């Protein structure tokens, strides 16, 4: 196993190769011109746990934890929407306590049928957006 090393960091070279590939995938995804082409790419690359039919994906990025995201049918996702499947608040609390007492909070997100999610919204862990819903922009 080859490793890259400097004075403070040792990293497996296969990890570096994987990180470079993921970075290039994200750059490529950002440059896909239409929402429908982005949906087709997400399906082809199997980036989400579930991606239904007639989905409009306007954001120029996809979540790192995509396997925790289910999007059902007839869903429109506007620009700059972010799906966050985890947080890092445990890092703050652990720093206050001086020892590791809190664990990382990780959850899934599910968006049911006939949903519109407005621009700039952030959907947090363990949220299920029910059918026939509108999520206001910036919420």
Question: Residue locations for each model-derived region?
Answer:
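Terminal amphipathic alpha-helical/low-complexity segments used for targeting or macromolecular assembly
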Residues: 1-48, 90, 132
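Cytochrome P450 catalytic-domain "roof"
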Residues: 51-53
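Flexible, glycine/small-residue-enriched loop-and-beta-strand segment within the central core
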Residues: 38-39, 56-129
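Generic detector of intrinsically disordered, low-complexity, polar/charged segments
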Residues: 49, 115-117, 135
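Short, intrinsically disordered, charge-balanced linker/junction segments flanking boundaries
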Residues: 132-139
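Hydrophobic, membrane-inserted alpha-helices
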Residues: 55-56, 135
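Intrinsically disordered, low-complexity boundary segments flanking structured domains
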Residues: 14, 44, 70-72, 139
């Amino acid at each position: 196993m080859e490793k890259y090393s400097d004075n403070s960091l040792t990293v497996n070279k296969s990890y570096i190769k994987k990180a470079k590939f993921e970075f290039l995938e994200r750059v490529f995804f950002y440059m896909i011109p239409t929402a429908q082409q982005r949906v087709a790419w997400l399906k082809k690359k199997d980036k989400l746990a579930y991606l239904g039919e007639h989905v409009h994906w306007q954001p120029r990025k996809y979540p790192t934890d995509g396997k925790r995201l289910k999007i059902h049918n007839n869903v429109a996702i506007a620009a700059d929407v972010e799906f966050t499947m985890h947080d890092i608040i445990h890092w703050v609390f652990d720093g206050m306590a001086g020892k590791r007492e809190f664990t990382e909070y990780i959850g899934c997100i599910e968006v049911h049928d006939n949903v519109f999610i407005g621009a700039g919204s952030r959907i947090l862990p363990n949220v299920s957006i029910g059918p026939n819903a509108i999520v206001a922009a910036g919420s």
